[in-house]
Regions:
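Intrinsically disordered, low-complexity regions
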Residues: 3-175
């Protein structure tokens, strides 16, 4: 089977499981509660952290887009019937990642309601901070595609691009 290279940080996101976990909090001791609170203070109701990685930075960027759309619907239900190209530019790598995700989000929110099944980054220009990508997918439609969480905005909050052993990115989105 295909192993997806992004993880949903469910304990930090608003999902039925997270809400159920909140209700179970009263069973925790004070000590357990203290341990539980040792990750960045995300507001579970309004924020979600995307964490994606790959063998290359291009792949990490691709996976980050798919992680974002993974909150909006089950991307496994999407068929690659249409092709969409997305380009973006920034003034550094973080702003490039921000605008890249924002452009993909715009493809969904601006009348097209496009959801990709797969995204391929054609190139990242690290000198000019430009990116070109292509996505295969289709228009979002109920009941074919389950409705997940609405992604309202990309944020710069705690955004990271790490390129040590394996390239990985961390992005917080408003939901």
């Amino acid at each position: 089977g295909h192993v997806s290279q992004y993880q949903e940080v469910s304990e930090r996101c608003s999902s039925p499981a997270a809400m159920a976990a909140d209700e179970r909090d009263y069973n925790l001791t004070e000590e357990q509660k203290a341990v539980k609170a040792k990750y960045p203070p995300l507001n579970k109701k309004y924020e979600c952290e995307l964490h994606a990685w790959g063998d290359t930075l291009e792949e990490a960027f691709e996976q980050c887009v798919m992680a974002m759309f993974g909150y909006m619907t089950d991307t496994e239900t999407v068929e690659p019937v249409d092709t969409v190209e997305v380009e973006a530019e920034g003034h550094d790598m973080l702003s490039l990642l921000f605008h890249f995700l924002d452009e993909w989000l715009y493809k969904f929110s601006a009348n097209e309601f496009f959801i990709p099944r797969e995204v391929k980054v054609l190139y990242i220009d690290r000198m000019q901070f430009k990116i070109r990508s292509i996505g295969w997918g289709e228009e979002f439609s109920l009941p074919k595609h389950p409705q997940g969480t609405e992604v309202k905005a990309i944020t710069y909050s705690a955004m990271q691009i790490c390129e040590d052993e394996k390239p990985e990115v961390f992005v917080i989105i408003d939901i």
